[in-house]
Amino acid sequence: MARNLRNRRGSDVEDASNAKVGYETQIKDENGIIHTTTRSLRKINYAEIEKVFDFLEDDQVMDKDETPVDVTSDEHHNNNQKGDDEDDDVDLVSPHENARTNEELTNERNLRKRKAHDPEEDDESFHEEDVDDDEEEEEADEFEDEYLDEDSKDNNRRRRAADRKFVVPDPDDDEEYDEDDEEGDRISHSASSKRLKRANSRRTRSSRHPETPPPVRRALRSRTRHSRTSNEENDDENDNSRNEALTLADEIRELQEDSPIREKRFLRERTKPVNYKLPPPLTASNAEEFIDKNNNALSFHNPSPARRGRGGWNASQNSGPTRRLFPTGGPFGGNDVTTIFGKNTNFYNQVPSAFSDNNNNKLILDSDSSDDEILPLGVTPKTKKENTQKKKKKKPEIADLDPLGVDMNVNFDDIGGLDNYIDQLKEMVALPLLYPELYQNFNITPPRGVLFHGPPGTGKTLMARALAASCSSDERKITFFMRKGADILSKWVGEAERQLRLLFEEAKKHQPSIIFFDEIDGLAPVRSSKQEQIHASIVSTLLALMDGMDNRGQVIVIGATNRPDAVDPALRRPGRFDREFYFPLPDVKARFKILQIQTRKWSSPLSTNFIDKLAFLTKGYGGADLRSLCTEAALISIQRSFPQIYRSNDKLLVDPSKIKVKVSDFMLALKKIVPSSARSTGSSPQPLPELIKPLLADQLNNLKNKLDYMLNIKDTTFQRNTSLLQNFIDYEEYSGEEEEHDKYGGNEDTSSFRSYEFFESMAESQICKPRLLINGPKGNGQQYVGAAILNYLEEFNVQNLDLASLVSESSRTIEAAVVQSFMEAKKRQPSVVFIPNLDIWINTIPENVILVLSGLFRSLQSNEKILLLCLAENLDISEVKNGILSDFAFDKNIFQLHKPSKENITRYFSNLIELLKTKPSDIPMKKRRVKPLPELQKVTSNAAPTNFDENGEPLSEKVVLRRKLKSFQHQDMRLKNVLKIKLSGLMDLFKNRYKRFRKPPIDDAFLVHLFEPETSNDPNWQPAYIKDENMILEVSTGRKFFNMDLDIVEERLWNGYYSEPKQFLKDIELIYRDANTIGDRERVIKASEMFANAQMGIEEISTPDFIQECKATRQRDLERQELFLEDEEKRAAMELEAKEQSQENILQEPDLKDNKANEFGVAAGNQLQAQLQTTINTASIVNNSEVPQPIDTNLYKKEIPAAIPSAVDKEKAVIPEDSGANEEYTTELIQATCTSEITTDDDERARKEPKENEDSLQTQVTEENFSKIDANTNNINHVKEIQSVNKPNSLHETVEKRERSPIPKEVVEPEQGKKSDKELILTPEQIKKVSACLIEHCQNFTVSQLEDVHSSVAKIIWKSKSAWDKTGTVDEIIKFLSE
């Protein structure tokens, strides 16, 4: 329509009659419809016309903004305003326009008629690619000649010629189009630019005359930048163009002239060269598409030029299955692509395709959510019920307001040695709940607070947990709140106090409840002027909450601390902390019970005697230390029984019932464990060592008797740490006080009080100022005696005042430390104030400190059980009686340590005489293993509890693998998405910067035959490109291409094909290698640049953790792919079998068996290959002509030496009878008999060994050669004779296991482990001589000097422990003593 609405010049009234005649003419089309004009037969592309209008409107807006105001145009507008008002439909025509002749118009119409509509080329009638370049130029020149003068015409021609010479087409602009499109663009370039020039000139005229817009001529949008640029440059030039107008007469004359009667017929003129290139053969899908395209040639649903020119014949594949050289499928799509190199595998489908009927839902991932379940037809999904109740507002006040879950597995039975405290806690918690009437009878309130204090690891926290668990039951629940200082403190002012209030309110709501403050010394320290105000406020709040105006109900507060002196004193009073439980280090009985508790659940529990001895050895161990000791002993027993599990990453099959803890395990654990009490400074309580007992045992017994007399320990009726309940259970109540109450002249109650007072005063009067000073020569074992006395007084509270304890804390003075220790001793009586090294102490400590301590002891009553125990060396007695120590009253309680007597020395050195008389064979020594450790079997994956089905039967390995892969599926999908996002930046950069690589080096149209096996197998077909392994071979040149492009890379990326960045980099490298193969310099440079950018970009996004996760995901993808291929093979086999069954009713059994035998899965490939190799190797060994002759067993008996040690098991080792042959002859004989696998290099190395190791070397050669003989002659019939005589199988198995064992091979030494009847060369006279020399030499020696002599003599004897002749040892001892 736009082409027909052309501007005509002038109008002739005479043509009206011709128009009338034209209207009366009737024309019939193909469908029989009558038309009166040819205009109705023309098909109009309204979409293109609308685009032209939009284009013109945009240009008009631009022209209005850019066109300057022209005075002449305004005058012309004013002059023509009158004519516009008279007739709006008639445009103004200049005289110059009227000068156009009818002959010119006729020629122009004839040129337009040559472009008549052709039904077969409907798609070409609306696009500028089919316009003849020469005719368009001629038409444009004639059109411009109508309005321009001669000078303007010449200028326009010169400018167009310069433009065509100057403008060079940009190759990058048309990279994405095919060659046909580029050719069409070049043809239509000049025509479209001319049309745009005419459109611009009309826009200029329309802007000058907005009242009468002329009819719009056809103006196509240019597809190149050059045409648009030319239009913009020529806007100013077209402003001076003449105005044109279309009158009604011109329109009527055009309708008359378009009549088919007057139209001349022109034959089709070919303007394009003939293309004799044969297209690729049509495939099945291409043929259907081609037929459909021809049938629908008259339709308007034609693709755009860019789409139509892309792909050529292969473009029709878009509606069918997509074809690619490389697989692009992933979990996000691309699995419907037919590939040549590789295969698309949708391995993210969890249900095997062989067992699934719905294969179209492969991309639907499995979900564990019930919302994703497929519902039956007609069933609506269940909607979540909204909670209509009013939701409770979550309390944001305290983060840890919820009570702590009580561990019901912990109870009082798990606590040993604290029976007294357990009974007292029960009467605080359980008894008020069970027997409230007992408390109401006396109108009392049970204690509501208790403070646990003592050394670390003594069971304070365990006691609180056991209390909550033991007192809770199904009928009554006790809520347990556990808080630490960090849970309460806050940086906001007043927040900590608010937290405490909320905690007590919550505990009161859930009463009965227990609040346990662990490490309460950090929450409520001692208030002082130097302390921060925040702690003082917290302490005040806690004091008010524990015992304020409000009754807190059945809320029990328990505090635990290691430093009771650091807790504020206001808390340590009845009403707040009613009771204070001191958790001391457990004594022997408590340790015995704790060890029983820790080992009672063992499969092989320890005996009572064993635990008793162990409890005696663990002095100073707390509850936590004893538990750690049992754990270490059990781990050491595991290491001793199964060391293989520490050298293997796989789970091995072990029998736990074979593991038993022995004495050696506990002894090793005792060396490893350091108890908590041993970490502190000063001497810790320890019993007298066994080695020192002969020297100090007698004097220590005398000290114990003296302490019993001083403190009256045995006559004490009740001790604080013992259970009062147990006392009432064991003893009856005293019944004589009712009968004797009249003797005291009062009633029953008064007499009872007087009776108790009398006997208590008599018992206390036996204690009077307990002081004890142990003095003796220097180095006479004072440290052993002091530790042994503290061990004997383990029920006493010990306060150590040694120098290290007093000066360790720089923040306090020595006087303060002394006063604090004394006050603690006074609170917890009976107690001991221990001062070691008193002689050094009085010379170091200032005199005022000694006076302060003496003043404190003076303030004590004489019957208080506070023992002052001091140790000294060579202290002057006069100084004790009359000097500065006289105030301590050591006059009568000074114990003098004497030097060991002759009898003590004789018993002390008796162990050395026993060591001297010990045979080397009786000395326990570490023996090297004779046999290697047995190889433990690996536990299969089915042993895990999750690898069993509902019936408890183990699942197969493949099912277990599928479950494992399914569990990682969501994680792998998430990682692929992360990888896509990280690589998307590089992908966008490559698409925009390197457009040349968006197409492969070889067009897909030339590779269509690769997808058709029938075509490729045709001998008459000679393709230009063929497949060569994983590359495309160009037959003419012999070059090979990978044919990778960026479109494939992008498709792979967004489909989730890549699991790790190196896959993406590998595809970019393929593009780079193809560029090198082509050899184009610019292409190689661009490809190298792209490859470098890819390398650096991937290196930036690659972190070690991310790469590790990507590798794991890649490995799982390979496993999924393997399972998928195996399922596909099974499915194909099932389909084939079903097809055969449909064709044949009865299958032959041999054929069926053969088919089943030939079906192998993917996972069975390695096993099948290994079996085939084994069969081939066996057959080659048997059929080989170089197999050695049968071996003479007698020859081995005579010639092979027997150098195997006696410790080797005779049943599993080969011990030849004769060992007289030399080593060289043996090696040569074995080499001649064995196969070629045994080389002579070992023999040459064996000859170079020293002669000292001939025996061991000969043994190793014999074992290795025997194992090789057996390994290489395993399939020979004559081997049975050798096995029957020499039994080489057992040796071969032993050596083979030794090589496979992770533990290195160890050979026993010949002299170790032998027990012989050989006697020592040691006479009784020599023993007596040594004993006499020792006693004579050590007369008047102190304990320290005796220890020195003992150590030196023990070294001499131990050095010659393996010698049977002790004469030299005796002489060396006597020589040492004489010196």
Swiss-Prot record:
Residues 1-39, 54-243, 302-330, 375-396, 1233-1274, 1291-1316 are annotated as: Disordered. ATP binds at G454, P455, P456, G457, T458, G459, K460, T461. Residues 61-78, 97-110, 1244-1254, 1293-1316 have a biased composition (Basic and acidic residues). Changing S304A: Severely decreases phosphorylation, causes a G2/M transition delay, and leads to sensitivity to 6-azauracil (impairs transcriptional elongation). CDD domains: Bromo_TBP7_like, RecA-like_Yta7-like. Changing T212A: Severely decreases phosphorylation, causes a G2/M transition delay, and leads to sensitivity to 6-azauracil (impairs transcriptional elongation). Belongs to the AAA ATPase family. Phosphorylated by CDK1 and casein kinase II during S-phase, which leads to its eviction from histone gene promoters and promotes histone gene transcription. It comes from Saccharomyces cerevisiae (strain ATCC 204508 / S288c). It is found in: Chromosome, Centromere; Nucleus; Chromosome. Residues 450-578 are annotated as: AAA-ATPase. Its EC number is 3.6.1.-. GO terms for cellular component: chromatin; chromosome; chromosome, centromeric region; cytosol; nucleus. Residues 192-207, 218-228 have a biased composition (Basic residues). Changing K460A: Increases YTA7 binding to the HTA1 open reading frame outside of S-phase. Increases localization of RTT106 and RSC8 to the HTA1 gene locus. Increases nucleosome occupancy at core histone loci. Decreases transcription of HTA1. GO terms for molecular function: ATP binding; ATP hydrolysis activity; ATP-dependent chromatin remodeler activity; ATP-dependent histone chaperone activity; chromatin binding; histone binding. The gene is YTA7. GO terms for biological process: CENP-A containing chromatin assembly; chromatin organization; chromatin remodeling; DNA-templated DNA replication; negative regulation of transcription by RNA polymerase II; nucleosome assembly; nucleosome disassembly; positive regulation of invasive growth in response to glucose limitation. Changing S285A: Severely decreases phosphorylation, causes a G2/M transition delay, and leads to sensitivity to 6-azauracil (impairs transcriptional elongation). Gene3D superfamilies: 1.10.8.60, Bromodomain-like, P-loop containing nucleotide triphosphate hydrolases. It is an enzyme of class 3 (hydrolase). It comes from the Eukaryota. The lineage of its organism: Eukaryota, Fungi, Dikarya, Ascomycota, Saccharomycotina. The keyword Zinc-finger does not apply. This is ATPase histone chaperone YTA7.
